[in-house]
Amino acid sequence: MADKADQSSYLIKFISTAPVAATIWLIITAGILIEFNRFFPDLLFHPLP
């Protein structure tokens, strides 16, 4: 079993990398949606008949 120092370093590493990874993922997703909407307008919204 890992000692306390290893566990706290893993926690600090997770806390510092999780927001960075989430931010990068959201920026990429937003970019894909923006470019899709630029090349194919009106395909992201389908009004009800």
From Swiss-Prot:
The keyword Nucleotide-binding does not apply. Keywords: Membrane, Photosynthesis, Photosystem I, Thylakoid, Transmembrane, Transmembrane helix. It is found in: Cellular thylakoid membrane. It comes from the Bacteria. One of its GO terms (biological process) is photosynthesis. May help in the organization of the PsaE and PsaF subunits. The chain crosses the membrane at residues 14-34. NCBIfam families: PRK02733.1. Belongs to the PsaJ family. InterPro entries: PSI_PsaJ, PSI_PsaJ_sf. It is a single-pass membrane protein. Its main location: membrane. GO terms for cellular component: photosystem I; plasma membrane-derived thylakoid membrane. Coiled coil: none annotated. This is Photosystem I reaction center subunit IX. It holds the Pfam family PSI_PsaJ. The keyword Iron does not apply.
